[in-house]
């Protein structure tokens, strides 16, 4: 079965959205939240890797747009060969960080909200990939701000003094 670049992109954002929501919903059980958040972050990263490689070998660029009720905000993504290269690099690093982070987060079990961490982690990965794909200036800025806010919450996650 062969998928198009657009289908890989839809899988990518679906995995990150579901992973973030499910890990946040499982916030009371650290093991479940960590497992679900990591699995969906890994699947989203693999979908991004497939989308990036498919875009690199595709003969032409792909554009996908969704109309909104705001005339100045078009949800439009565009993936050409350059975006495919960046998406491939980001996805590969994200996948490796997810695999490493799954074991690393065990020592935070019972100390912090692991579900919230994986919510922001999935949001960060999805918005970082969205920055490379945004085809509209305002949409790019929204994705950039989502990425910035998610990274802030990831940085302050370990906020207790040791």
Where would I find each of the regions flagged by the language model?
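Transmembrane helix-loop-helix hairpins at membrane boundaries of multipass inner-membrane proteins
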Residues: 1-8, 21-119
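Short conserved micro-motifs on helix faces and helix-strand junctions that flank
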Residues: 13, 77-78, 91, 133, ...
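Membrane-embedded alpha-helical core segments of multi-pass
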Residues: 15-19, 44-47, 90-100, 122-125, ...
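Alpha-helical multi-pass transmembrane bundles of energy-transducing inner-membrane proteins
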Residues: 31, 116-162
């Amino acid at each position: 079965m062969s998928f198009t670049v657009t289908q890989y992109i839809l899988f990518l954002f679906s995995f990150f959205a579901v992973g973030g929501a499910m890990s946040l919903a499982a916030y009371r059980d650290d093991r479940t939240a960590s497992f679900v958040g990591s699995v969906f972050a890994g699947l989203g990263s693999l979908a991004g890797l497939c989308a990036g490689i498919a875009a690199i070998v595709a003969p032409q660029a792909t554009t996908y747009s969704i109309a909104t009720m705001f005339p100045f905000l078009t949800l439009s993504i565009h993936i050409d060969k350059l975006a495919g290269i960046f998406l491939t690099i980001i996805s590969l690093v994200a996948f490796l960080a997810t695999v490493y982070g799954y074991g690393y987060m065990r020592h935070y079990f019972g100390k912090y909200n692991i579900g919230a961490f994986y919510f922001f982690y999935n949001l960060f990965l999805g918005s970082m990939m969205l920055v490379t794909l945004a085809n509209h200036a305002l949409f790019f800025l929204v994705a950039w701000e989502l990425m910035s806010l998610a990274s802030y919450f990831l940085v302050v996650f370990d906020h207790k003094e040791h």
